[in-house]
Amino acid sequence: MSLEDSLRSLSLDYLNLLINGQAFSDVVFSVEGRLVHAHRCILAARSLFFRKFFCGPDPPSGLDPSGNRVNPSGSARSGVIPVNSVGYEVFLLMLQFLYSGQVSIVPQKHEPRPNCGDRGCWHTHCTSAVDLALDTLAAARYFGVEQLALLTQKQLASMVEKASIEDVMKVLLASRKQDMHQLWTTCSHLVAKSGLPPEVLAKHLPIDIIAKIEELRIKTSLSRRSLMPHHHHPHHHDHLTAAADLEDQKIRRMRRALDSSDVELVKLMVMGEGLNLDEALALPYAVENCSREVVKALLELGAADVNFPAGPTGKTPLHIAAEMVSPDMVAVLLDHHADPNVRTVDGVTPLDILRTLTSDFLFKGAVPGLTHIEPNKLRLCLELVQSAALVMSREEGNNNNSNNNNNATASSATNMYPHHNMNEDHHHSHNNNNMDSRLVYLNLGANTQMSTSRMDSGDDDNTHREAINNSMYHHHSHGHDY
């Protein structure tokens, strides 16, 4: 057996102690109402925090708000230690690292997550993955597990390269708060390159950080100018920079106009200044930040593509409206021929997003990340998009039937039969889809407390063991050695 195999076997042996729950356990934690059985000697050996907590004369506060202390002799401690500083999932991830030296700070692929609406998401750089990494980083710092903190920083640095700009700004704030200079540098450059104007950044970042972002943009612009060739066309780079600045100014003016519902000014910019609404992401911005009337007026200009894919993920305005669970936005977009079947780069349709949110409500109840969603609005959005998809499917079927009829010869009477069967099958499929839709979205009106109570039931030890068995081995198999 090689050294690597020996270490892997040792790691699994220790991890099995955690998975087996009460086996040889001498300490119990309560996290979000669930019991977690662990072993003091392992925790004390792997973490200075736990070493002081269990054996030191002055254990740190916070892990046990009741103020109970462990006596120096290490005798069994009565009662359960409450943990209020971190969540259950993050606490288990941290314990997995302490026991095995390995961990994967990425949710299981395709696992439904409360703050990820994409069905089939691999959770490599979505909001759910970023939030889990940030929570794990905070826990690692709080409990003094520096190796886990370093691993999480590396994970975040790779995530932000593909994450949304909102998540990048979230990581930027955390990196400043926890003095993570390398992560700060990476995120600040990404925000600077995003082109978002200060008035938009102000919705997410404090003023002092915005000032540093603007300062970085100026330095980057000067550096870019100094690296440009000067031997021919000496003023060419000045013209390019001026053109880029002009486009930025146009986009800022356009967004200010949309914020103030001044669609006429946007129209003048399109006609007189050649503003490209698709490249300026006017419609996604309006859907996310403005009223239904502004979006409708913008669409009626006829200068914006309602199905234009924005950003690296390729989301259309209808994807955004579905994530927002806004029936008004969904309706006005569908009225202007938004495609309910259009897919993102990852193959997700607006209908997929709404079905995932519906599933979370039906089977999980009220969970963090979904509290802002009203079931009635979700039901209405699902009905609108489902109906639009069925109408489009029916129209495509009719077009196919018409083409088949035109290509058929007059003497081929048998062609009527497959035509009849196609309509019959389509009608049958249409009825099934309608039934599926009704079964799904009508249940949204049910009492979500049933799901919540279902989650809270069951034995704590079995819940702990099942949670580790379902997730720990996944994390272990894709982990990193430390």
Curated annotation (Swiss-Prot):
Gene3D superfamilies: Ankyrin repeat-containing domain (1.25.40.20), Potassium Channel Kv1.1, Chain A (3.30.710.10). Pathway: Protein modification; protein ubiquitination. Expressed in the shoot apical meristem (SAM) at the base of the developing leaf where stipules are formed. Associated with functional and vestigial abscission zones (AZs), including pulvini. Residues 25-107 form the BTB domain. It is a peripheral membrane protein. GO terms for cellular component: cytoplasm; nucleus; plasma membrane. GO terms for molecular function: transcription cis-regulatory region binding; zinc ion binding. Disruption phenotype: Altered morphology of stipules and flowers. Altered abscission of senescing leaves, leaflets and pods, and of petals in developing fruits, even after complete pod senescence; this phenotype is associated with a reduction of cell organization and/or differentiation in pulvini, organs present in abscission zones (AZs). Partial loss of nodule identity characterized by the development of ectopic roots arising from nodule vascular meristems. Residues 398-415 have a biased composition (Low complexity). One of its GO terms (biological process) is induced systemic resistance, jasmonic acid mediated signaling pathway. SUPFAM superfamilies: Ankyrin repeat, POZ domain. It comes from the Eukaryota. A zinc finger (C2HC NPR-type) spans 113-127. SMART domains: ANK, BTB. Induction: Induced in roots during nodulation. ANK repeats lie at residues 249-278, 279-308, 313-342, 346-380. Belongs to the plant 'ANKYRIN-BTB/POZ' family. 'NOOT-BOP-COCH-like' (NBCL) subfamily. Homodimer. The BTB/POZ domain mediates the interaction with some component of ubiquitin ligase complexes. May act as a substrate-specific adapter of an E3 ubiquitin-protein ligase complex (CUL3-RBX1-BTB) which mediates the ubiquitination and subsequent proteasomal degradation of target proteins. Transcriptional co-regulator involved in the promotion of leaf and floral meristem fate and determinacy. Promotes normal stipule growth and development. Required for the abscission of senescent organs, probably by regulating the cell wall disorganization in abscission zones (AZs, e.g. pulvini at the base of leaves). Involved in the coordination of the symbiotic nodule developmental program. PANTHER family: BTB/POZ DOMAIN AND ANKYRIN REPEAT-CONTAINING PROTEIN NH5.2 (PTHR46668), REGULATORY PROTEIN NPR5 (PTHR46668:SF1). This is BTB/POZ domain and ankyrin repeat-containing protein NOOT1. It comes from Medicago truncatula.
